[in-house]
């Protein structure tokens, strides 16, 4: 039995910082660009594991570079991935995030493999979080 099982999304976040968000049809220059592991589910699983909880994650990724990155992050954090699925021919979820100088963000999510997540028949955990 795990302390925490998270059923949720795993995304590769593509983050650009810019002075201001563009208006429709407008192009603005970005100041910085970075990629981060993300997704509400993966973020919750990482937080639980870092807090010392034995943690499992139920989710889905593609068999692409982004999916391999997210799997590696979860493994490094000590998260059990026995119910984590690699989907062929379906891309890993992505989030395109713009952050302005005030820290306000705008997010577009492409669910990808997250749209294929299926809850297992049973979960053995003290706490279950659903973060899709």
Annotate each PLM feature.
Residues 51, 77, 90-93:
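Short, basic and Ser/Thr-rich N-terminal targeting/leader segments
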Residues 36-43, 88-91, 114-118:
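Short secondary-structure boundary/capping elements
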Residues 1-60, 65-69:
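Glycine-rich phosphate/adenosyl-contacting loop at the front of the ribokinase-like
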Residues 1-10, 60, 68, 72-86, ...:
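Ribokinase/PfkB-type carbohydrate-kinase core domain
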């Amino acid at each position: 039995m795990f302390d925490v099982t998270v059923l949720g999304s795993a995304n590769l976040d593509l983050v650009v910082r810019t002075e201001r968000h563009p208006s429709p049809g407008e192009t603005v220059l970005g100041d910085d660009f970075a990629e981060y592991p993300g997704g509400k589910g993966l973020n919750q699983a990482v937080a639980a594991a870092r807090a010392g909880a034995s943690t499992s994650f139920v989710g889905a990724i593609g068999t692409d570079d982004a999916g391999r990155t997210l799997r590696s992050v979860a493994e490094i954090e000590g998260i059990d991935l026995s119910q984590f699925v690699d989907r062929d021919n379906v891309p890993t979820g992505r989030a395109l995030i713009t952050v302005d100088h005030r820290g306000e963000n705008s997010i577009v999510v492409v669910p990808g493999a997250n749209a294929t997540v299926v809850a297992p028949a049973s979960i053995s955990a003290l706490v279950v979080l659903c973060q899709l």
